[in-house]
Amino acid sequence: DYVDAASYELGRSYIAQERYAEGAGQLERFIADYPSSPRRAQALADLGLAYLNLGDKEKSLKYYDMVVETAPQSSEAKGAMQGIREIYVSDGKVDDYFDYAARVGMESDLTAMSRDSLSFAAAQKLYLAGQTDAAAKSLRSYVRSYPKGYYLNDALYFLSDCYLRTGERGDAIETLTELAGQGTNQYSVTVLEKLSELTYEDKRYDEAAAAFRKLYDVTTTVAGREDAMTGYVRATLAGGDASKIEAMAADVAAHPDAGAVALRESKFAWAELLRQQDRRADAVKLYRELAADVRSKEGSAAAYYVLEDTFEKGDMDKTEKAIFAYSEREPQAYWLAKAFILLGDVYVRKGDNFQARATRASRTAIRLPTTGSWTKPRNGSQN
């Protein structure tokens, strides 16, 4: 029928010229006038395309669905399924698409890999569009459905970012922890930096220490490795577990590139443990190493403990000289004040009551500042 063909070709030509509204109107007249035309499936498919380009997804789905129902084995049906898939994926409703494909008997075309890919694509589209809540829901569905999925790392990374955007710290930490456990990947450094920061701030020190330690292993810059190891030291110290502090100190000592701050703070912590365990000789050995630089609080404290050890061994002349030498090195104020208090005790031991009184008088003018906390969050190479 030439009239039939002409009517269809007119509508198709409009679509070819991207005159979609005119094309849709002509093709709708065509299928109404020629319901039994052999070109009906083609016209329905073209209508689905026209309305998709016009932004009317509901009408597009209607016509694509008509193609699949009336001519399921046709090439037009396969094209219609692609259009239907695109609409569902763009709306983040990939599971609805899978249900639809199963209902119309087209699920055989969906391999496990294509299902994986489509599910992630739908979630990613929502994430990139800034639809955080919808993206999080879709990403959670992907992670549950494809625990070994090809895009699992990407999904976990995007999901953790969604949680951070909405202030769900606990869920963010859980997701970041899962991603950190997937082995080294493109997100490892960023993930471990954020995970260590969040867990430290939340006083989850064991988790923070583990994250900092992993970060040291994966980061490639010198500064990054030093900061990571410093964080590892401080998180472990904040946790307060003596056995973990001992293991951490040994671990750091075995890594010369851990950085001066981490090496110093871990060595001092180990010396403190030894002193608490009455292993004074071993502690003093470490204190002597740290005492070489009194600009840091650890160095100032270590040098003072060396003075204290000399005093306790009974050599008052040596202790006196050492205290004056210590004062000339400009240690931190708290430990300098402690040293002058010790000097007064030296004079008492020596029977020099005049000097003892003079020292006591001078130290009343000294206000001893507090030492502060030994543990701080990671913040570069602080003294």
What kind of region is each of these model predictions?
Residues 1-383:
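Acidic, polar-rich low-complexity tracts and alpha-helical solenoid repeat scaffolds
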